[in-house]
Structures are given as structure tokens and as C-alpha cells.
């Protein structure tokens, strides 16, 4: 085994590509490394096409092995299970730029598997996996029009940073991944801390320029180690069948695309398909339905694109830069913490915001360790949203991807834990869909968060742009329909505030999209975003002043970190008793910050008072109220200050002689006591002599005591 190795510098990192030693029965295999983060990528391509196959069956799987980080998986089975959300998102990140580079009509099955086998906590494996997949596909000999490069771009101290480390990413105002060929950008995925359109475009151009070193080195690697190129030839078009279908369907399809209502248009198109299939298969039984449908789809594309390029109205009658009619309702669900329905044309999202406590945060087990996520965003796309029946179950890849994009759009305006100590979950239920449901989710989420009283920094809106390009002519479309997305050349989603962009996602199906075209699309998207924000601001101009009556109220107080163990108690007994007796939820941070969540304000105040009792220091000569916890022959033990026990000796119960303690005291009895002494072992001696229930007791120590305003803050 003589492996072939290619090594090169990529920004501040060293990239190594190796092939020929492992997985030699795969069509191609590459071990890709970047500074100790290593991803093993394999490609298997079938030489034969399945009979009746009428689509390109490309599968991309990305999997992380815990041994890569020197860890053993948790759980009962102690092995990796189904893909996590993070793994699914990275699989999509690899898939999106490579899929458009396979030729039309190529239907051979291809599977790409990327396995993380070693991880340096400072280097994210997603970029390494993308480079490895590009190299493996290029080596395999399949008709892949790559290679592609991939780059991550950060923005630190007003400078673009190529492939920042994870430490640098924490201080970066931008996390942008761009992939493309030597000639064109194909895919962008990003989140930003409210940057301008010009800064976002500059980041895309910067990343594309920098990744050329990857593309050049993969080309050299292929010259040295690549397999012979497949002699695949695109199937010859069936001209006779195309002409037959055109004669029967072209005029009718043109008329159908004058129907502006989606369902009525689809019914007409389906009727045309059924009629043409029936006529042609009756004449010739060897003609496949799939071939007829492919020709009709091509006719649809030609008609719609031709009209747009010619300057005619779009499918639903709009001009190129018109946003569909908007309708907004907030506070639509009575018992939820915040809700909104956002409708844009035939796309509608029901967004619901829920406030929770620290214990509701999601613990994410990553290769580099556990992390906590305080903002959750879930996107659901039920089949009824497009008038279909279908399976209901765990979220699909598309739902996970759309949810993450919408989350990226809103994340930049979310308050910090110090500003708003709640965990927040937003769920977007897509109730109708005809294009741009992820951007409707951004708008709906912003409205629902404001309805819930979450102090977001600004309202956020999202818009999906499209592009139709024929040779030198091109048209940028605002607020695309589902058909325009399917038949167009670009899907370009932008979310942001009035001040700038918070998220950008781009998928381009053709080469030749210049920075100038992207600039036009960004500027047109900005105009659409401002229009949507104006309508949203009329519906709800600012976050509600107060949270819902049904949301938990979080009160915070500070205690001495050394006293945390006293509040928790042995085996959690004290804190458990507090929560059970008052119906509250209590979280304590290592710095002594105590967060009490309760729907009843009085219950929260009672808990705070009791915690103050627990952490307060017992003072000699101070007088307290307490409860008798035990009666013994030589006296009684009394609990003061929320659990500290002291002894009232038999001689200190009264000035008279006491024969039996039980004659004077019983368990549970409330008494007034004075602290006589605290010895070196912190044992407390108490007396009841010369005291009665009218004697003034020390302040801020009883259950009824109020906590000072400096020690609590009600959020």
C-alpha cells in the first residue's frame, strides 16, 4: 500500500489529502485533515442505472465518532445512534454545492459518507468534510463537474478572517461558509451580527477567492491519483416524443400558468398530464409516463422563464419586485406565552414562543463536549400545508435545515441571559406553503417573541429571492413562489433588521452568477425586507411590556457561593423541600446567583425569604423565632434561620425549675429564642428565659420577612 498524499497551506492551517491506503473497494476514498481534525470520506458510485430511474439518487451521510475526541458514547448501548441535528445540517452543507455539478440526465446511484475520525477542538470538521467530499468525488471518475472549494469566513475587528478557529468564532460577528467552483459561487450559509449587505457580499467574494487554493490542489491531486473518467454520455433526447407532447400540451400549459391561484393551477396541470399520458400511451405502450412528465416539466420551465425574461407578469400576476399581500395577527392563542400568525400570499406560519427556566435549556453532546442552548427553534412542515396527505413523525432533513436557518435569522437580536434569564423556544407551524416558508418563520418568530414580551433588540424579517438567467439577460425576483424556486436558477434567502443582515443562505444551480448580480439581489431583498418590517411594526411596534400571566416569573437574588451547599442541603433535601412546598422552580449558579421561577409572585417571595434565612449568619444576643424539632431529657433542639439547629438546655427554658421538658415544649411548637453562645464547633446555645412571643425578633430572618430590593430583581 503506497498512499498518495497532497499537502498544502490554507490560510493559517495545513490541509492534507491522502488516498490509496484505506477503503480500496470504494469507488474513491480520501482521508482529509486540517490541523489534526480528520474526516474520512468515501464515494461509491454504481455503474448501472436502475431500471425506471428518473431522478438523481445522490445520498450524503455525515457521521461523528466519539473516539475522534477520545470519548466513549453515553447512554445504555454505549455506541453512536441516529444522526444528531448537527450531523444532519453538515450532511446538507456537503450535499448542496455538489448536487448541481452532476449533469442533467445522470441517474446513477452515488453515496458519499463522511466520517469524523479525529478532532482538534479548534478546527470544525464541517469544512474538512466538504473539502474531502470534493476531493473524493473528483478522484472517483464520475461525471462530476468539480472540484469545489469551501471556506469559512469570520469578521473580527472589522477584518475578514479565513477559516477562524472555534475560539476566534466566539468573538466573530460573522460565521459564513461559502462553497463554489473555480468560476462561480454555488452555496452560502451564514449568520451575522447585523452586518450590511455590502459587508456580506464582500465576505462571499473573499471566501470564494481564498478557496481557489483548495480547488487548484485538488486538481493536482486528481492528476496524480484520479481514476479514469467515466465515458458517460447524456441520453439523446427523444425528439419525436418531445414534438408530440409539445403539440398536445404547450398551449394548454401556457394557459394554465395564467391561473394565479396555486391549487387551481396545479389541478389544471395535473389534468393536462393525465390527458397527454392517456393519449400517447394508448398510441404506443412502450412510452413511459416518466418520460412524458419530464417533457411537460421542461415545457413548464421554458414557458415560465420565457415570460419572466420577456418582462411579462409573473405566475401570480406580480411584477418582479412586488411582495405578496401580508396579513399579521398576534396573540392568537390564549394560553401560550406568545403567538402570531404571519401570512404572505399563500404561505402562512403559526409561530409560538414559550418561556422556560434554565433547566429547560437543551444540553447538546458534541464531540468537543457538552454545551447548553438557551434558544430553541423548531420548524414543522405538515403535509396539509400543501394540500397533501403524508407521514407524520420525526423531523426530516429539510425541516431541520429550515429551522436552523430561521434560528440564525433571529439569533442576533435575542437578549443575553443577564438581560432576560429565560430559556426561549419558538415553534413555527407551516400551515400553508407556496414558497419561502423558512422566511415566513423568521417573521412569525419575531412577532411571537415580541408578543411574549421577550426584549429582542429589533424586529427581524426574511425574504426569499429568485433568479432567472438566459445568456446575458437576467431577472431577479422578490418573494418567490414555490414554482419560481423550482424552475429558477437561484434560491437566495436574506433575513435581517432595519440596520442590517442577520442570516444569508444561497443555493445557485448555474454558473455565471456574478458579484454584480448578487449585489442587485441583495439590494432588492433589502427593499422587500423594509416593506415587510413596516407592516410588522404596525401590528406590534415593540415587545410587550410584561410577559404572559401564564409564563413563569423569574426572580433573581445573590447569595454567598459558600452558602450554596446550605440551600441545596444534604442530598438536595432542603432545595427539594422548598420547591415542593411552594410549587416553584429553583436554579443556583456557581457564582451564587439564585433564580426562582414561579407563576405565583407570593410563592416566589416566600422562597426568597426562606433562602435569606438559610444563608443568614446567626448572631450572638440576636432574638429569633424558631420551631422545636426534637425534645430530649436535657432540653430541646430548636430550628432557626431556615434550618440551623440550636439547643435550649433544660435550665434555659424558664426561670422556674423544670422537671420534664415535655411539660413545656413539644415538637413543632413555635418559640422565641435568644442566641447565648456559638462555640468553636459552631454549636448554638439558646435560651428562652425572659422572652415571650411579643419580644421583637431579628429582622429579615423569619419566613414572613421581606427581602430587600437590592437583593432581588423581578424580571
UniProtKB/Swiss-Prot annotation:
Entry GO CC: cytosol
Parts of the chain that traverse the membrane: none
Source taxon at top rank: Bacteria
Enzyme class: transferase
Molecular functions (GO terms): 3'-5'-RNA exonuclease activity; magnesium ion binding; polyribonucleotide nucleotidyltransferase activity; RNA binding
Classification via Pfam families: KH_1, PNPase, RNase_PH, RNase_PH_C, S1
Cofactor(s), by name: Mg(2+)
Compartments (UniProt record): Cytoplasm
Main location: cytoplasm
Biological process terms in GO annotation: mRNA catabolic process; RNA processing
Start and end residues of each KH domain: 552-611
Region (Disordered): 695-715
InterPro entries assigned: ExoRNase_PH_dom1, ExoRNase_PH_dom2, ExoRNase_PH_dom2_sf, KH_dom, KH_dom_type_1, KH_dom_type_1_sf, NA-bd_OB-fold, PNPase
Keywords: Cytoplasm, Magnesium, Metal-binding, Nucleotidyltransferase, RNA-binding, Transferase
S1 motif domain sequence ranges: 621-689
Plastid as UniProt keyword: no
Reaction(s) the record says it catalyses: RNA(n+1) + phosphate = RNA(n) + a ribonucleoside 5'-diphosphate
E.C. numbers: 2.7.7.8
Family indicated by similarity: Belongs to the polyribonucleotide nucleotidyltransferase family.
Physiological role: Involved in mRNA degradation. Catalyzes the phosphorolysis of single-stranded polyribonucleotides processively in the 3'- to 5'-direction.
Subunit structure, interactors included: Component of the RNA degradosome, which is a multiprotein complex involved in RNA processing and mRNA degradation.
HAMAP family: PNPase
Name assigned to this protein: Polyribonucleotide nucleotidyltransferase
Amino acid at each position: 500500500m503506497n498512499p498518495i498524499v497532497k499537502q498544502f497551506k490554507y490560510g493559517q492551517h495545513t490541509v492534507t489529502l491522502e488516498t490509496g491506503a484505506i477503503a480500496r473497494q470504494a469507488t474513491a476514498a480520501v482521508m482529509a485533515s486540517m490541523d489534526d481534525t480528520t474526516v474520512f470520506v468515501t464515494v461509491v458510485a454504481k455503474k448501472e442505472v436502475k431500471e425506471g430511474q428518473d431522478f438523481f439518487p445522490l445520498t450524503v451521510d455525515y457521521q461523528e465518532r466519539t473516539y475522534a475526541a477520545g470519548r466513549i458514547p453515553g447512554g445504555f448501548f454505549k455506541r453512536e445512534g441516529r444522526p444528531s441535528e448537527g450531523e444532519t445540517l453538515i450532511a446538507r452543507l456537503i450535499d448542496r454545492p455538489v448536487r448541481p455539478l452532476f449533469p442533467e440526465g445522470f441517474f446513477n446511484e452515488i453515496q458519499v459518507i463522511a466520517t469524523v475520525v479525529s478532532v482538534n477542538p479548534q478546527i470544525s470538521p464541517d469544512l474538512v468534510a466538504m473539502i474531502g467530499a470534493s476531493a473524493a468525488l473528483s478522484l472517483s471518475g464520475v461525471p462530476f463537474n468539480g472540484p469545489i472549494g469551501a471556506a469559512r469566513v469570520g469578521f473580527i475587528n472589522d477584518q475578514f478572517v479565513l477559516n477562524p478557529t472555534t475560539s476566534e468564532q466566539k468573538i466573530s460577528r460573522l460565521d459564513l461558509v461559502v462553497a463554489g467552483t473555480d468560476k462561480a459561487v454555488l452555496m452560502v450559509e451564514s449568520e451575522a451580527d447585523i452586518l450590511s449587505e455590502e459587508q456580506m457580499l464582500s465576505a462571499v467574494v473573499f471566501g470564494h477567492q481564498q478557496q481557489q487554493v483548495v480547488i487548484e490542489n485538488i486538481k493536482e491531486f486528481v492528476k496524480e491519483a484520479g481514476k479514469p473518467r467515466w465515458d458517460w454520455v447524456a441520453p439523446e433526447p427523444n425528439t419525436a416524443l418531445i414534438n408530440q407532447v409539445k403539440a398536445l400540451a404547450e398551449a394548454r400549459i401556457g394557459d394554465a400558468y395564467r391561473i394565479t391561484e396555486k391549487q387551481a393551477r396545479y389541478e389544471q396541470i395535473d389534468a393536462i398530464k393525465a390527458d397527454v399520458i392517456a393519449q400517447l400511451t394508448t398510441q404506443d405502450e412502450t412510452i413511459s409516463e416518466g418520460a412524458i412528465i419530464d417533457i411537460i416539466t421542461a415545457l413548464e420551465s421554458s414557458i415560465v422563464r420565457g415570460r419572466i425574461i420577456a418582462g411579462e407578469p409573473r405566475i401570480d400576476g406580480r411584477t418582479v419586485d412586488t411582495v405578496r399581500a401580508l396579513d399579521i395577527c398576534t396573540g392568537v392563542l390564549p394560553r401560550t406565552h406568545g403567538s402570531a400568525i404571519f401570512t404572505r400570499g399563500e404561505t402562512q406560519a403559526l409561530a409560538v414562543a414559550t418561556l422556560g427556566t434554565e433547566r429547560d435549556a437543551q444540553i447538546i453532546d458534541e464531540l468537543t463536549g457538552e454545551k447548553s442552548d438557551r434558544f430553541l427553534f423548531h420548524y414543522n412542515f405538515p403535509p396539509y400545508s400543501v394540500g397533501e396527505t403524508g407521514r407524520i413523525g420525526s423531523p426530516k432533513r429539510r425541516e431541520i435545515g429550515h429551522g436552523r436557518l430561521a434560528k440564525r435569522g433571529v439569533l442576533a437580536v435575542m437578549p443575553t441571559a443577564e438581560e432576560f434569564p429565560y430559556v426561549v423556544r419558538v415553534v413555527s407551524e407551516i400551515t400553508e406553503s407556496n414558497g419561502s416558508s423558512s422566511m415566513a418563520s423568521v417573521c412569525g418568530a419575531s412577532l411571537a417573541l415580541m408578543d411574549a414580551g421577550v426584549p429582542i433588540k429589533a424586529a427581524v424579517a426574511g425574504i426569499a429571492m429568485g433568479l432567472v438567467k438566459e445568456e446575458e439577460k437576467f431577472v431577479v425576483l422578490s418573494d418567490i413562489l414555490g414554482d419560481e424556486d423550482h424552475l429558477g436558477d437561484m434560491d437566495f434567502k436574506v433575513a435581517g433588521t432595519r440596520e442590517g443582515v442577520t442570516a444569508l443562505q444561497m443555493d445557485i444551480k448555474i454558473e455565471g452568477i456574478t458579484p454584480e448580480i448578487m449585489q442587485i439581489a441583495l439590494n432588492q431583498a433589502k427593499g422587500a425586507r423594509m416593506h415587510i418590517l413596516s407592516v410588522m411594526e404596525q401590528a406590534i411596534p415593540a415587545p410587550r411590556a410584561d410577559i404572559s400571566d401564564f409564563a413563569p416569573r423569574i426572580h433573581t437574588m445573590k447569595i454567598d457561593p459558600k452558602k450554596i451547599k446550605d440551600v441545596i442541603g444534604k442530598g438536595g433535601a432542603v432545595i427539594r423541600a422548598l420547591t415542593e412546598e411552594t410549587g416553584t422552580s429553583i436554579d443556583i449558579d456557581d457564582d451564587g446567583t439564585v433564580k426562582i421561577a414561579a407563576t405565583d409572585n407570593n410563592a416566589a417571595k416566600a422562597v426568597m425569604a426562606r433562602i435569606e434565612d438559610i444563608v443568614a449568619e446567626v448572631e450572638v444576643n440576636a432574638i429569633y423565632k424558631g420551631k422545636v424539632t426534637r425534645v430530649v431529657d436535657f432540653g430541646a433542639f430548636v430550628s432557626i434561620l431556615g434550618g440551623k439547629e440550636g439547643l435550649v438546655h433544660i435550665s434555659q427554658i424558664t426561670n422556674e425549675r423544670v422537671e420534664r421538658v415535655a411539660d413545656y415544649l413539644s415538637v413543632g411548637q413555635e418559640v422565641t429564642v435568644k442566641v447565648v453562645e456559638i462555640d468553636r464547633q459552631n454549636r448554638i446555645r439558646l435560651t428562652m428565659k425572659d422572652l415571650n412571643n411579643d419580644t421583637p425578633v431579628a429582622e429579615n430572618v423569619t419566613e414572613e420577612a421581606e427581602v430587600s430590593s437590592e437583593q432581588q430583581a423581578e424580571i
